[in-house]
Amino acid sequence: MLSRIQNYTSGLVSKANLLSSKALYYGKVGAEISKQIYLKEGLQPPTVAQFKSVYSNLYKQSLNFALKPTEVLSCLKNIQKNELLKYGAYGIQLIGFYSVGEIIGRRKLVGYKHH
């Protein structure tokens, strides 16, 4: 019984090592491709003026919604099914990116050492 458990866990560990090495390889390939696209397309970070305009518009809209909550409710009531699916997919992607960032930051899949 113990030997079966050891064989199972060793097989599981070897598969995990294989998957992690593949993930590392494809991550590096993706980073290199992204770097080449960044250089060829001439991409650049947004300017300070662009940041200011985006965040000032966001602030104005959030202030407007805070002052007139009935408009928020009317907007939510008028959402179509396709829009709801699209925004739900965006939300799932954001949660996924956040979760991956947390995993990378902790350097482990679950929890911190002191908890």
From Swiss-Prot:
Residues annotated with N-acetylmethionine modification: 1
InterPro entries according to UniProt: ATP_synth_F0_gsu_mt
Modified positions (Phosphoserine) in chain numbering: 3, 62
GO biological process: cristae formation; protein-containing complex assembly; proton motive force-driven ATP synthesis
Molecular-function annotations in GO: proton transmembrane transporter activity
GO cellular component: mitochondrial inner membrane; mitochondrion; proton-transporting ATP synthase complex
Subcellular location: Mitochondrion membrane
Coiled coil: none
Modified how: Phosphorylation on Ser-62 impairs ATP synthase dimerization.
Main location: mitochondrion
Keywords for the protein's UniProt record, in alphabetical order: Acetylation, ATP synthesis, CF(0), Hydrogen ion transport, Ion transport, Membrane, Mitochondrion, Phosphoprotein, Transport
Pfam families: ATP-synt_G (PF04718)
Its biological purpose: Mitochondrial membrane ATP synthase (F(1)F(0) ATP synthase or Complex V) produces ATP from ADP in the presence of a proton gradient across the membrane which is generated by electron transport complexes of the respiratory chain. F-type ATPases consist of two structural domains, F(1) - containing the extramembraneous catalytic core, and F(0) - containing the membrane proton channel, linked together by a central stalk and a peripheral stalk. During catalysis, ATP synthesis in the catalytic domain of F(1) is coupled via a rotary mechanism of the central stalk subunits to proton translocation.
Similarity annotation: Belongs to the ATPase g subunit family.
Subunit structure: F-type ATPases have 2 components, CF(1) - the catalytic core - and CF(0) - the membrane proton channel. In yeast, the dimeric form of ATP synthase consists of 17 polypeptides: alpha, beta, gamma, delta, epsilon, 4 (B), 5 (OSCP), 6 (A), 8, 9 (C), d, E (Tim11), f, g, h, i/j and k.
Protein name (record): ATP synthase subunit g, mitochondrial
Native source species: Saccharomyces cerevisiae (strain ATCC 204508 / S288c)
